[in-house]
Amino acid sequence: MARFLTLCTWLLLLGPGLLATVRAECSQDCATCSYRLVRPADINFLACVMECEGKLPSLKIWETCKELLQLSKPELPQDGTSTLRENSKPEESHLLAKRYGGFMKRYGGFMKKMDELYPMEPEEEANGSEILAKRYGGFMKKDAEEDDSLANSSDLLKELLETGDNRERSHHQDGSDNEEEVSKRYGGFMRGLKRSPQLEDEAKELQKRYGGFMRRVGRPEWWMDYQKRYGGFLKRFAEALPSDEEGESYSKEVPEMEKRYGGFMRF
């Protein structure tokens, strides 16, 4: 008893779905029959659906429709091939976009408009590349030439970089072998060089000129030259400072900062 109740419950649940499926199939078959006939008025669509569902005792219209459907079955593969052909069109467009890249992005709207204005016939599909070349002129050729020029320019840049690196390496090798060229190029700044006697004399002169500025020494010989050059400015400044003989008395009065730096502050 419980199994019977369960079966009835399942039938009640699945019944509306099955009826809807049967109705949909019947209406689709009857619509196909009326479409296949030269004169659709020869078949009553409502009567055909009701006979298919079993609501009418007469089955004349439904039998005629079934015979027509059986005769039209060989024509279905042709429809299937047309659908396959329609599905293959997006794949072909995807391959074209993948192949020509920037050209499709640049001139895509123009090509689409041309396709709408001048649709391609089935006989012309075999020679698609020639027709594209004739239809779109030199656009595709120009794009290919641009790609070739970019590739050539990148190769040329690589060659220039490689030659520059080789030249720099050879130059460094020659510079390591020849120390005189390095000294001429960098002037001894990059590495320490042995000074000639002439350079030693110049260094001594520089030491004499600026050395006493950092330590307490007497007035140099070139004091008169500076005196002539700067007029009475240095003279007035020197007169304002105490002499060396008065250093002891002056050291008692000067601040501790002047004691620390000595002649640097007094000069």
Swiss-Prot record:
GO biological process, one term: G protein-coupled opioid receptor signaling pathway
Signal peptide range in chain numbering: 1-24
Sites bearing Phosphoserine, chain numbering: S251
Comp. bias (Basic and acidic residues): 163-175
Modification(s) after translation: Proenkephalin-A is cleaved by CTSL to generate Met-enkephalin.
Keyword Disulfide bond: yes
Entry superkingdom: Eukaryota
Propeptide: 196-207, 217-227
Cellular location(s): Cytoplasmic vesicle, Secretory vesicle, Chromaffin granule lumen; Secreted
InterPro entries: Opioid_neupept, Proenkphlin_A
Annotated segments matching region Disordered: 163-182
GO molecular function, one term: neuropeptide hormone activity
The keyword Signal is assigned to this record: yes
Xref: Pfam families: Opiods_neuropep (PF01160)
GO terms under cellular component: axon terminus; cell body fiber; chromaffin granule lumen; dendrite; endoplasmic reticulum lumen; extracellular region; neuronal cell body; neuronal dense core vesicle lumen
Listed transmembrane segments: none
Site residues, Cleavage: M111, K112, K113, A133, K134, M214, R215, R216, G218, R219
Keyword terms, alphabetized: Cleavage on pair of basic residues, Cytoplasmic vesicle, Disulfide bond, Endorphin, Neuropeptide, Opioid peptide, Phosphoprotein, Secreted, Signal
Disulfide cysteine pairs (residue numbers): C26-C48, C30-C52, C33-C65
PANTHER family according to UniProt: PROENKEPHALIN, PROENKEPHALIN-A
UniProt record similarity statement: Belongs to the opioid neuropeptide precursor family.
Protein name: Proenkephalin-A
Organism: Homo sapiens (Human)
